[in-house]
Swiss-Prot record:
Name of this protein: Tissue-resident T-cell transcription regulator protein ZNF683
Native source organism of the sequence: Mus musculus (Mouse)
SUPFAM superfamilies with a match to the protein in the record: beta-beta-alpha zinc fingers (SSF57667)
Tissues where the protein occurs: Expressed in tissue-resident memory T (Trm) cell population in non-lymphoid organs, such as skin and gut. Expressed in innate lymphocytes, including tissue-resident natural killer (trNK) and natural killer T (NKT) cells in thymus, spleen and liver.
Gene Ontology terms for molecular function: DNA binding; promoter-specific chromatin binding; zinc ion binding
Keyword field contains Zinc: yes
Species classification: Eukaryota, Metazoa, Chordata, Craniata, Vertebrata
SMART domains: ZnF_C2H2
Length: 458
């Protein structure tokens, strides 16, 4: 028997219970004798109860041990004339009911009453014009009768990752309007502001929101690929008064940022400078120091110094370098300058020693094709050109040009020299003596050239 009593004491220890009656809570030990709660004839048991501080809720609930089970009985104020049997039926309905269900029902009733009061208070406020009305959301929230403490946060917000969330429900952000508070009227909770460090997903939008958003895409970020959220560095104010003042600034920031994004590079100011065209000028003609003439609807590319005509504008520009003395192309080895790039490339062959052009008759090589053409005239026996000032016939191609230049300058050159007739006569005589000296030293005579060509052919 002692072993059975010890086992019973270990399985069913002394049951301490609390009695919630009106504004006081009382505790008692199960070992003390208690009167029957149904009969309620002997009230001497209430004198042995120890009054405790006020309970958080007014619930006439009494816990009474009956055999090894714990039964809950409700103490209700009954009107006069009601039979005790009716009280027994009410008490039997409350027997064997788990404490958690009763607690859940009371909590749900409190939340329901609280929500209804909040909605009545918010409904009395006047509606604000010039902004769309926000209907209450009933699809994404569960029924008020369910136990909100027993449900996990993933039930309300399935897109959130499993993070530590406090007991206060998170606050959602709905469409941002300058004159509206942060939350819509039906869901403006009275909970205090929570620090954003403990709740990284505090400012979240529901995944299936039916309200249009005003904030631009640059202010919203995606968290783990689901549900847009506002970045943490853009902290929002939770109280409605401060947000009403900050709503206009947020809207203006969004508009200014979108306007900056839609600007073209030409409208960016200093970052993309625009080119201003000179009035009355065309592209490509700005480099010329003088206007071009037109004849029969065509532009004449004529040099204003020597009057030479060209078929293209680029050729005229290259020709103008001869008169201006400009030589933009310089050799990196000998620092020699040239007016054209082709002349510089040809000059590089002198430093490299390359001779790409070869004569097919004597297999002599040349650095340029023009020199090869001049050399081929020796093998062909072509008659040389005759000088207009003297009866000499010259075979090489370079020598007739030099001969003509030294013999007598052109009339156009004579007009620029402004020399008298006597000076011109002396110059012609000097040219004649110089030509004779060159011919003697170089051996450029007609007879010698003809004999050399005949000997090679024979």
């Amino acid at each position: 028997m002692k072993a059975l009593d010890g086992l019973r004491e270990s399985l069913y220890p002394s049951l301490d219970f609390q009695l919630y009656q009106d504004d006081q809570v009382c505790s008692a030990d199960a070992s003390q004798p208690l009167a029957d709660s149904v009969g309620a004839h002997d009230l001497a048991w209430s004198e042995r109860m120890c009054p405790l501080p006020l309970a958080p809720a007014k619930s006439p609930l009494l816990a009474c041990p009956e055999s090894p089970d714990l039964c809950l009985c409700a103490l209700q104020k009954t009107p006069l004339g009601r039979a005790p049997q009716d009280l027994g039926e009410d008490a039997s309905n409350m027997r064997h009911q788990p404490p958690s269900l009763y607690k859940a029902s009371t909590d749900s009733e409190k939340l329901t009453i609280k929500d209804s009061l909040n909605r009545e208070e918010m409904g009395n406020e006047p509606e604000r014009g010039a902004y769309p009305h926000l209907p209450p959301r009933t699809s994404s929230f569960p029924d008020a009768g369910l136990d909100r403490k027993s449900l996990s946060p993933l039930t309300f917000w399935p897109w959130l990752p499993p993070t530590l969330i406090s007991k206060e429900p998170p606050i959602h952000i709905y469409p941002i309007f300058p004159g509206y508070p942060l939350l819509p009227l039906p869901y403006l909770f009275t909970y205090g502001a929570l620090p954003s460090a403990q709740h990284p997903y505090l400012f979240m939008l529901p995944p299936h929101s039916t309200y249009p958003t005003v904030a631009g895409p640059s202010l919203l970020m995606t968290a783990s690929g689901s549900g847009p959220r506002i970045p943490q560095e853009k902290t929002l104010l939770l109280h409605s008064g401060a947000f009403q003042s900050a709503g206009h600034t947020l809207h203006s920031q969004v508009e200014s940022r979108s306007s900056r994004d839609t600007r073209t590079p030409g409208q960016a100011g200093v970052a993309a400078p625009t080119r201003r065209a000179v009035p009355g000028s065309r592209a490509g003609v700005i480099a010329l120091p003088y206007p071009l003439k037109k004849e029969n609807g065509k532009i004449l590319y004529e040099c204003n110094v020597c009057g030479k005509n060209f078929g293209q504008l680029s050729n005229l520009k290259v020709h103008l370098r001869v008169h201006s003395g400009e030589r933009p192309f310089q050799c990196a080895l000998c620092q020699k300058r040239f007016t054209q790039l082709a002349h510089l490339q040809k000059h590089h062959l002198v430093h490299t020693g390359e001779r790409p052009h070869q004569c097919q008759v004597c297999h002599k090589r040349f650095s340029s094709s023009s020199n090869l053409k001049t050399h081929l005239r020796l093998h062909s026996g072509a008659k040389p050109s005759q000088c207009g000032l003297c009866p000499s016939y010259l075979t090489p191609n370079v020598y007739p040009k030099l001969h003509h230049r030294l013999r007598a300058p052109q009339l156009r050159g004579l007009t620029h020299t402004h020399l008298p007739l006597a000076s011109l006569t002396c110059l012609a005589q000097w040219h004649q003596g110089a030509l004779d000296l060159v011919e003697k030293k170089m051996g450029w005579t007609v007879d010698k050239v003809s004999s050399e060509s005949k000997g090679k052919q024979g």
